[in-house]
């Protein structure tokens, strides 16, 4: 009798467990296996439109194998940024559908707050999607096609790769030379002229014609910096009044092996709170912004070049 009672109680408990799981399990509305966003053959994308409600609306176009920003400004784009974006796009997989309910758009930022991404191959639109927030694990982006209510999981952090303003897409290259081709550098600041000249394989520093000792390794670091100079950021509205009258603080020039000379002007920070150096090529109109660490090196500061044991 005791064994029979135990069996009845065990059966009742098992039934309760089955009922619990049957009533509490809440599966996703739709689920399917991972599928590539672009099935073979993949499109040759040559134009991209990004509509970002929180930042700039961007148009990127490929011209003769080189990518450019064509709106809201005309400027060469960062080739690496676009190549990485396209690589991520072409390897993106759709890992399942989260919801088909229109009211779920706001929850996943694929409604009015989402980023619209359109891609073209020639005259054909190959993708028109709204990208939303990323998953907690940072492995997926919530997305939906613009003409659909179906909210899906895209594997990868693709949404974060396109969420940037126009300056985030710009090519940050200022100069691109082989450091070995730099023959001399000169900085003119008021009545003081600081110069670095390559004598065979040794750099020589002079200040108003007077030679001073320098650390060769530090000097080569400066030469490498200027030869392959990339900006930290681009000048913005608050910087424009500073350079409006072209009243720069330092003029820096460098010569290369073929005899050409390249010159840029530097505006040093007006106070400690500014912490930014502004740079513009003498024949250019683009204003570059450098933070203190690198900007202070551009003016050929002797204190940064002298040997460590020099007082």
Question: What spans do the regions from the language model cover?
Answer:
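A short-motif feature that recognizes glycine-rich, charge-decorated loops
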Residues: 1-311
């Amino acid at each position: 009798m005791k064994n029979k009672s135990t069996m009845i109680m065990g059966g009742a408990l098992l039934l309760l467990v089955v009922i619990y799981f049957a009533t509490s399990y809440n599966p996703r509305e739709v689920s399917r296996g991972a599928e590539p966003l672009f099935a073979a053959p993949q499109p040759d994308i040559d134009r991209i439109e990004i509509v970002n409600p929180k930042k700039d609306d961007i148009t990127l176009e490929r011209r003769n194998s080189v990518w450019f920003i064509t709106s809201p400004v005309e400027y060469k784009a960062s080739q690496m940024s676009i190549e990485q974006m396209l690589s991520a796009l072409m390897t993106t997989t759709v890992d399942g559908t989260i919801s088909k309910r229109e009211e779920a758009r706001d929850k996943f930022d694929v409604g009015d707050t989402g980023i619209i991404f359109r891609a073209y191959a020639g005259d054909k639109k190959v993708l028109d999607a709204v990208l939303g927030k990323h998953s907690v694990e940072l492995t997926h982006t919530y997305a939906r096609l613009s003409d659909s209510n179906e909210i899906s999981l895209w594997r990868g952090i693709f949404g974060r790769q396109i969420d940037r303003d126009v300056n985030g897409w710009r090519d940050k290259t200022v100069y691109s030379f082989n450091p070995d081709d730099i023959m001399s550098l000169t900085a003119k600041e008021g009545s003081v002229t600081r110069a670095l000249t390559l004598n065979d394989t040794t750099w020589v520093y002079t200040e108003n014609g007077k030679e001073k000792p320098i650390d060769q390794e530090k000097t080569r670091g400066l030469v490498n910096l200027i030869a392959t100079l990339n900006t930290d950021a681009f000048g913005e509205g608050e910087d424009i009044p500073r350079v409006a009258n072209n009243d720069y603080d330092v003029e820096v020039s460098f010569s290369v092996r073929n005899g050409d000379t390249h010159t840029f002007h530097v505006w040093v920070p007006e106070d400690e709170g500014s912490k930014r150096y502004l740079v513009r090529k003498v024949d250019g109109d683009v204003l570059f912004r450098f933070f203190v660490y690198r900007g202070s090196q551009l003016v050929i500061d002797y204190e940064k070049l002298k040997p460590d044991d020099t007082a």
